Amino acid sequence: MTMDKSELVQKAKLAEQAERYDDMAAAMKAVTEQGHELSNEERNLLSVAYKNVVGARRSSWRVISSIEQKTERNEKKQQMGKEYREKIEAELQDICNDVLELLDKYLILNATQAESKVFYLKMKGDYFRYLSEVASGENKQTTVSNSQQAYQEAFEISKKEMQPTHPIRLGLALNFSVFYYEILNSPEKACSLAKTAFDEAIAELDTLNEESYKDSTLIMQLLRDNLTLWTSENQGDEGDAGEGEN
């Protein structure tokens, strides 16, 4: 039995409340594959679903990678760690490729508003970034390049079409700066991008409308937290606090 769009959206909302994000993602994938432009609510449901689905694997991957490094003296344990990490990597890659296919086949093509276009291009940058975290060699270069390209395109549209206080423009600056810091190892560029986004938003705080006030100020706080972390002397810590945007 095929469900219509409103039933699938309702199913996604139920799954979100039950914290069953795989079900939520499957429902929103089916909505997207119907080929219509998504409403803001549907777009956010899709984003939240996949962010949680991929986030669980990214977190598992980090834990296992760290354990693997600590078991270097024990070959058997290390082999087990490696095999388990590769299993998680395969899941993570499948999820990212699913999202990237939805973006290229439906979402970016169907986006009529600049806001949607930026949202989806940012998402494309994010999921190529997640792929690059677990990639190596030539594959790593390709995913890094694709990520940067998507972020850059989104960034240019956002500067032209959106207020500096818009939560989507701020969220893009946040993640693009994390990309520079973590993936390209360019702390100067990361700090410059984050600082400019923060300063431009501060200068136009009076343009903030009530509905996005909370989202925008939360992302501004994350930008500032990352700047503090990145400019502090002990740069050994990961700057991944910059993933808390909506």
Curated annotation (Swiss-Prot):
Homodimer. Interacts with SAMSN1 and PRKCE. Interacts with AKAP13. Interacts with SSH1 and TORC2/CRTC2. Interacts with ABL1; the interaction results in cytoplasmic location of ABL1 and inhibition of cABL-mediated apoptosis. Interacts with ROR2 (dimer); the interaction results in phosphorylation of YWHAB on tyrosine residues. Interacts with GAB2. Interacts with YAP1 (phosphorylated form). Interacts with the phosphorylated (by AKT1) form of SRPK2. Interacts with PKA-phosphorylated AANAT. Interacts with MYO1C. Interacts with SIRT2. Interacts with the 'Thr-369' phosphorylated form of DAPK2. The modification 3'-nitrotyrosine is found at Y84, Y106. Pfam families: 14-3-3. This is 14-3-3 protein beta/alpha. The modification Phosphoserine is found at S60, S186, S232. GO terms for cellular component: cytosol; melanosome; nucleus; perinuclear region of cytoplasm; transcription repressor complex. It comes from Mus musculus. Keywords: Acetylation, Cytoplasm, Isopeptide bond, Nitration, Phosphoprotein, Ubl conjugation. One of its GO terms (molecular function) is histone deacetylase binding. There is a cross-link at K51 (Glycyl lysine isopeptide (Lys-Gly) (interchain with G-Cter in SUMO2)). The modification N-acetylthreonine is found at T2. The modification N-acetylmethionine is found at M1. Adapter protein implicated in the regulation of a large spectrum of both general and specialized signaling pathways. Binds to a large number of partners, usually by recognition of a phosphoserine or phosphothreonine motif. Binding generally results in the modulation of the activity of the binding partner. Negative regulator of osteogenesis. Blocks the nuclear translocation of the phosphorylated form (by AKT1) of SRPK2 and antagonizes its stimulatory effect on cyclin D1 expression resulting in blockage of neuronal apoptosis elicited by SRPK2. One of its GO terms (biological process) is negative regulation of DNA-templated transcription.
